[in-house]
């Protein structure tokens, strides 16, 4: 007696495992292919297993707050409170992302960060270093170039394009990145009261940023620029992107001082002059109402729940910045001359003089490079051509009086050696 196979019966079969229709419970049809219920179940198991492995790896991969701060200490001098707050905020943010793939009754909300501090206090450096620690895509955007949709300038979606480019167009990777929006204080509305005229580069930009800060699926033009109807867009979910907004917020210390002064009136008030309370102390007392008075809209403030304040850098901090970090400027210039077999030495008084000049210019740590570059340009121009120079010494007079640095040559070394031999 003959036994008919599925093929003889003209039955359909699974394109993956080859089983016929009568050998499985269900066969799902696609364009020219079929898949059985057993293969579907196996695919689901493989995907779930891979996802759980990926999540477990990420949980182990995120450094603890103390580890994040320890690495920040290697690059950023001072700002202890700011580094602690940022370390905790970033750690919690990535814990929240990892929890998101698991079913849980507690939903953790997104916590974007607002950084306030004088120019050159380390806002951008902190954000860059965080991205390097976590090995995630990082993009810097300038809020002053943004305008409301439909006006000349950049759309807010162009910020996300920079992040996508930093992730080499890997959307999944970009969706876990960090975006630093600089000069966010420049998009404050021009007056405290709502305006009847359109403020396209101030309040309008704040309104446009609300959705991407909170979390939305944004349509990003792949080539940047303005959107137009006959264009394909890149879809990116901003729910798990950490936004750090930074700004100097010049003048907000006066707003805080006025509020603190009003609350301190009457008998038993702690009377302190403005000179006694420096800007750093005042910024630590910042409240949402101060940001509102400065010109940020309530919805924008609400989407930046973590406020980090940075102190102005003093002379000692600037001296440490010049010498201590891994990428310290003194170390960088020493390395540059070392490549020409020349030893570079900065005397302690010279380093102090550079720090004082940066304070005088009121440029913070950012101004240090300009001062050193001015000192070193002639040296770096002349010295590589001379084979007799072995050492270059930068003194206080080189910084303050624009004198020539001390160049130690092989002849000097020989004469010193001869004198030692003669005295012996």
Curated annotation (Swiss-Prot):
<feature type="binding site">
    <location>
        <position position="36"/>
    </location>
    <ligand>
        <name>Zn(2+)</name>
    </ligand>
</feature>
<feature type="binding site">
    <location>
        <position position="17"/>
    </location>
    <ligand>
        <name>Zn(2+)</name>
    </ligand>
</feature>
<dbReference type="GO" id="GO:0009376">
    <property type="term" value="C:HslUV protease complex"/>
</dbReference>
<dbReference type="GO" id="GO:0051301">
    <property type="term" value="P:cell division"/>
</dbReference>
<protein>
    <recommendedName>
        <fullName>ATP-dependent Clp protease ATP-binding subunit ClpX</fullName>
    </recommendedName>
</protein>
<feature type="binding site">
    <location>
        <position position="39"/>
    </location>
    <ligand>
        <name>Zn(2+)</name>
    </ligand>
</feature>
<comment type="subunit">
    <text>Component of the ClpX-ClpP complex. Forms a hexameric ring that, in the presence of ATP, binds to fourteen ClpP subunits assembled into a disk-like structure with a central cavity, resembling the structure of eukaryotic proteasomes.</text>
</comment>
<dbReference type="GO" id="GO:0008270">
    <property type="term" value="F:zinc ion binding"/>
</dbReference>
<keyword id="KW-0479">Metal-binding</keyword>
<dbReference type="GO" id="GO:0140662">
    <property type="term" value="F:ATP-dependent protein folding chaperone"/>
</dbReference>
<dbReference type="Pfam" id="PF07724">
    <property type="entry name" value="AAA_2"/>
</dbReference>
<feature type="binding site">
    <location>
        <position position="14"/>
    </location>
    <ligand>
        <name>Zn(2+)</name>
    </ligand>
</feature>
<dbReference type="InterPro" id="IPR046425">
    <property type="entry name" value="ClpX_bact"/>
</dbReference>
<dbReference type="InterPro" id="IPR050052">
    <property type="entry name" value="ATP-dep_Clp_protease_ClpX"/>
</dbReference>
<dbReference type="GO" id="GO:0005524">
    <property type="term" value="F:ATP binding"/>
</dbReference>
<dbReference type="InterPro" id="IPR010603">
    <property type="entry name" value="Znf_CppX_C4"/>
</dbReference>
<comment type="similarity">
    <text>Belongs to the ClpX chaperone family.</text>
</comment>
<dbReference type="Pfam" id="PF10431">
    <property type="entry name" value="ClpB_D2-small"/>
</dbReference>
<dbReference type="InterPro" id="IPR027417">
    <property type="entry name" value="P-loop_NTPase"/>
</dbReference>
<dbReference type="GO" id="GO:0046983">
    <property type="term" value="F:protein dimerization activity"/>
</dbReference>
<keyword id="KW-0067">ATP-binding</keyword>
<keyword id="KW-0862">Zinc</keyword>
<dbReference type="GO" id="GO:0051603">
    <property type="term" value="P:proteolysis involved in protein catabolic process"/>
</dbReference>
<dbReference type="GO" id="GO:0051082">
    <property type="term" value="F:unfolded protein binding"/>
</dbReference>
<dbReference type="InterPro" id="IPR038366">
    <property type="entry name" value="Znf_CppX_C4_sf"/>
</dbReference>
<dbReference type="InterPro" id="IPR003959">
    <property type="entry name" value="ATPase_AAA_core"/>
</dbReference>
<dbReference type="InterPro" id="IPR003593">
    <property type="entry name" value="AAA+_ATPase"/>
</dbReference>
<dbReference type="Pfam" id="PF06689">
    <property type="entry name" value="zf-C4_ClpX"/>
</dbReference>
<keyword id="KW-0143">Chaperone</keyword>
<dbReference type="InterPro" id="IPR004487">
    <property type="entry name" value="Clp_protease_ATP-bd_su_ClpX"/>
</dbReference>
<feature type="domain" description="ClpX-type ZB">
    <location>
        <begin position="2"/>
        <end position="55"/>
    </location>
</feature>
<keyword id="KW-0547">Nucleotide-binding</keyword>
<dbReference type="InterPro" id="IPR019489">
    <property type="entry name" value="Clp_ATPase_C"/>
</dbReference>
<comment type="function">
    <text>ATP-dependent specificity component of the Clp protease. It directs the protease to specific substrates. Can perform chaperone functions in the absence of ClpP.</text>
</comment>
<dbReference type="GO" id="GO:0016887">
    <property type="term" value="F:ATP hydrolysis activity"/>
</dbReference>
<feature type="binding site">
    <location>
        <begin position="118"/>
        <end position="125"/>
    </location>
    <ligand>
        <name>ATP</name>
    </ligand>
</feature>
